[in-house]
């Protein structure tokens, strides 16, 4: 019996020791497990904070880059507009210098009124188009909101058989707005073509003025040539036979009458009623008809091209593709189309300029064949009109003096002096006419060039303004759409967050209930154990009393020991309850931490998706820009080859023209030498004639008529030779002036082509710099992705319990593997 008691005592003691050791082991494990969880969560928090900081930095950098690009584009546009405004102001000032206030007619006033009306109508059309665009944007935003709100309940409506009438009505309204925009664009094109018509009318009016002045100058030249020839004939016949003086007087009177008729014809010629120049006018009118027909044909082709482009650009299939495009793709698409339109426009402008140059060449050829040149302005014509009566008065004086000479027969020297003065005046008039013609041609060319520059600058300004307005409208549309998408995503994330919160609250309640049940069952088991132990002790006590009354003291001691053990067990149970409560609190805290970690992971997942989308967009932009740059390089290479060929052709032309100039100069020198020799011979013959006359007078001999006739024949031959040499010199001067004009034109074309090449090279350099910047951004973002992937891959065994993060890791791995393969391929 003693041994059993000892065993029981030993067993109880051993049980007590086991419980203590188990409790100590549990506490140690908990303490050991608490530290790594906390460290892991702290590492995750620090890692996510680093990622957040890097993402914020990348966002700030991308926003700053985008703002810089936008400001750069705006500054470039503003600089271009300012440059064009300055050029317009300079050109207008130069035109004001050449403009004469007395030439304003009723036609110019009507043209100004027409221009004001067209400007007012164009401004009203622009306002209408702006209103229609704003209405379209509002309708599109309403449609998107309607689709987004009713997207979740669309299946329910379809299952119930409900109609989608509001969607159809809104789509119909959008179609109506598009049709109205089409009609507005067509009206704008018609108004533009109507504005182009007065410019052609003005050109015809200018050509008519130039032709009238050319005809007047041709008539004056022909009359002056006849007058000079008659004067020379009179001079040749004057020294031989004094009996012919009366005939010369009659011819001078005839010349006076012709000059009066010319003066009268000047007055009639201002109204355009001249009968002698019908053939020349017919030729010029035919040339004007050809030019106007070509301009109208080109304008009709331009209109047809614009209508075709507008009709093809507004196909419904194309509209569907535009609806499915993203904002960046839409912007790139519109930029490509605008570049194409600019290229077509520049090509057509080049064709028109070439046609204008061809017509000008034909016109110059006609002027050279018809031997009429341009006269100065109305002031110079007025000066000529004033000189004609002065010449008539001088002719009257000559007639009076000739009559006196016939009556007296002694004033030969005075007549010769007057004839010389008249010849000098005629030469001065010729020089003034030639100078006036040159000035008129220069002024007409300058005016034509300035008008072309003004038209080009106005078209460029209108294009830039239209582009700016389109950019503003498109940017507004995309901003509104982007804000709506952000609001929708925010609502969806709020709903998901509320659903997750409710689910986690339910899970926590279930866990708390389960833990309470477990603690109650453990307490009941401990109570049952204690009751069983008490019953065993009572049985043993009774048996010990029956067997031996001697061991009562030992049993009492044993009972006291048992009571102490029971008390210690109760204390241990209370301590265990406290530990269980503390563990429950720790579990709740860990669940809260897990929930926050999941939320942070979800947000970071979204951020990583956004970053990956941005990287994909940047890669697509880089690829597109590379393709565009390659296309531009190819086009520039083709254009440069063409321009180099043209430059080579111009250089060959210049060399040939220089050779012709040298030949012409040599011929001029030869002609001058011949003229000088003939003048010397004439002076010698005159001196010999005078000496012979003096000798004859001194000898008082009768001169035979044969000698007089021989002298007259010599004088006629000498006069003919001088006339021929003068005509040849004039022809050479005209050829030299034409060659100099051609050389100047070729030089101007070469300079313009060089400027175009330099501009295109600068544009290519800018595009390459932008591509380099985008490549650097892509590389930095890829480096950031690699760092994120390495950090997440380090915690891959822990993150296996989160499938969303594993999917993100797979996507990142694919992106990185694709980027590593691309440069190798």
UniProtKB/Swiss-Prot annotation:
Keyword Coiled coil applies: yes
Under the subunit heading, UniProt states: Interacts with WPP1/MAF1 and WPP2/MAF2.
InterPro entries, per the entry? WAP
Q: Which interval of the chain is the signal sequence?
A: none
Keyword tags: Coiled coil, Cytoplasm, Golgi apparatus
Q: Which residues form a coiled coil?
A: 124-147, 251-271, 410-521, 563-788
Give the transmembrane region(s).
Answer: none
Listed GO CC annotations = Golgi apparatus; mitochondrion
Q: Specify whether Coiled coil is a keyword of the entry.
A: yes
The record's annotation in PANTHER family points to: WPP DOMAIN-ASSOCIATED PROTEIN (PTHR33883:SF10)
**Protein name per Swiss-Prot or TrEMBL:** WPP domain-associated protein
- Give the location in the cell: Golgi apparatus; Cytoplasm
């Amino acid at each position: 019996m003693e041994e059993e008691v000892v065993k029981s005592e030993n067993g109880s003691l051993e049980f007590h020791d086991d419980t203590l050791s188990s409790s100590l082991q549990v506490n140690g494990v908990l303490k050991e497990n608490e530290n790594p969880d906390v460290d892991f969560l702290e590492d995750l928090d620090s890692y996510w904070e680093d990622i957040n900081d890097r993402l914020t930095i990348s966002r700030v950098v991308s926003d700053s880059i985008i703002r810089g690009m936008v400001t750069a584009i705006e500054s470039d546009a503003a600089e271009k507009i300012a440059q064009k405004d300055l050029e317009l102001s300079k050109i207008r000032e130069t035109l004001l210098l050449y403009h004469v206030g007395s030439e304003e007619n009723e036609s110019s006033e009507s043209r100004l009124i027409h221009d004001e009306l067209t400007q007012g109508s164009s401004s009203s059309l622009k306002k209408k188009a702006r209103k229609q665009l704003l209405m379209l944007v509002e309708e599109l935003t309403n449609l998107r909101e309607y689709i987004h709100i009713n997207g979740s309940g669309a299946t329910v409506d379809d299952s119930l058989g409900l109609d989608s009438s509001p969607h159809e009505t809104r789509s119909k309204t959008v179609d109506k707005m598009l049709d109205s925009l089409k009609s507005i664009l067509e009206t704008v094109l018609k108004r533009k073509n109507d504005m182009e018509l007065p410019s052609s009318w003005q050109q015809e009016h200018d050509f008519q003025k130039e032709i009238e002045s050319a005809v007047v100058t041709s008539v004056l030249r022909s009359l002056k040539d006849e007058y000079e020839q008659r004067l020379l004939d009179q001079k040749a016949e004057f020294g031989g036979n004094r009996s012919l003086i009366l005939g010369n007087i009659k011819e001078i009177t005839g010349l006076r009458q012709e000059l009066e008729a010319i003066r009268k014809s000047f007055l009639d010629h201002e109204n355009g009623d001249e009968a002698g120049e019908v053939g020349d006018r017919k030729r010029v009118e035919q040339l004007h008809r050809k030019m106007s027909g070509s301009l109208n044909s080109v304008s009709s082709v331009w209109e047809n091209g614009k209508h075709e482009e507008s009709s093809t650009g507004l196909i419904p299939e194309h509209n569907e593709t535009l609806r499915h495009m993203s904002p960046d793709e839409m912007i790139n698409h519109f930029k490509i189309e605008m570049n194409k339109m600019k290229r077509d426009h520049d090509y057509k402008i080049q064709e028109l300029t070439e046609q204008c140059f061809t017509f000008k060449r034909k016109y110059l050829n006609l002027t050279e064949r018809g031997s009429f040149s341009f006269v100065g302005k109305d002031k110079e014509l007025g000066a000529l009109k004033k000189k004609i009566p002065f010449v008539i008065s001088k002719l009257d004086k000559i007639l009076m003096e000739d009559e006196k000479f016939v009556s007296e027969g002694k004033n030969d020297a005075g007549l010769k002096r007057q004839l010389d003065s008249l010849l000098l005046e005629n030469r001065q008039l010729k020089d003034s006419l030639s100078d006036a013609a040159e000035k008129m041609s220069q002024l007409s060319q300058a005016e034509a060039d300035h008008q072309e520059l003004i038209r080009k600058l106005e078209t460029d300004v209108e294009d830039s303004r239209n582009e700016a307005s389109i950019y503003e409208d498109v940017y507004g549309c995309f901003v509104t759409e982007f804000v709506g998408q952000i609001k929708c995503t925010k609502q969806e994330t709020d709903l998901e967050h509320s659903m997750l919160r409710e689910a986690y609250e339910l899970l926590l309640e279930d866990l708390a209930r389960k833990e309470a049940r477990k603690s109650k069952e453990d307490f009941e088991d401990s109570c049952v154990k204690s009751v069983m132990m008490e019953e065993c002790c009572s049985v043993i006590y009774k048996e010990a009393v029956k067997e031996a009354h001697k061991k009562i003291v030992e049993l009492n001691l044993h009972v006291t020991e048992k009571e102490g053990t029971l008390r210690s067990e109760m204390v241990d149970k209370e301590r265990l309850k406290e530990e269980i409560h503390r563990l429950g609190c720790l579990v709740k805290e860990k669940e809260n931490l897990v929930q926050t970690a999941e939320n942070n992971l979800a947000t970071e997942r979204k951020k990583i998706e956004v970053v990956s989308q941005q990287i994909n967009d940047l890669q697509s932009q880089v690829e597109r820009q590379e393709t565009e740059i390659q296309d531009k390089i190819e086009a520039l290479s083709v254009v440069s080859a063409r321009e180099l060929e043209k430059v080579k052709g111009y250089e060959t032309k210049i060399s040939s023209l220089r050779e012709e100039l040298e030949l012409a100069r040599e011929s001029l020198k030869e002609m001058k030498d011949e003229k000088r020799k003939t003048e010397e011979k004439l002076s010698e013959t005159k001196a010999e004639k005078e000496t012979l006359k003096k000798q004859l007078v001194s000898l008082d001999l009768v001169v035979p008529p044969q000698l007089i006739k021989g002298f007259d024949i010599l004088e006629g031959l000498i006069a003919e030779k001088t006339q021929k040499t003068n005509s040849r010199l004039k022809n050479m001067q005209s050829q030299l002036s034409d060659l100099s004009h051609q050389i100047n034109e070729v030089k101007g074309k070469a300079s313009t082509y060089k400027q175009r090449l330099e501009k295109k090279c600068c544009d290519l350099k800018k595009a390459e710099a932008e591509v380099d910047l985008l490549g650097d951004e892509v590389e930095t973002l890829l480096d950031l992705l690699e760092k994120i992937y390495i950090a997440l891959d380090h915690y891959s065994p822990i993150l296996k319990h989160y499938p969303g993060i594993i999917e993100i890791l797979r996507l990142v791995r694919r992106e990185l593997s694709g980027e590593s393969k691309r440069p190798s391929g």
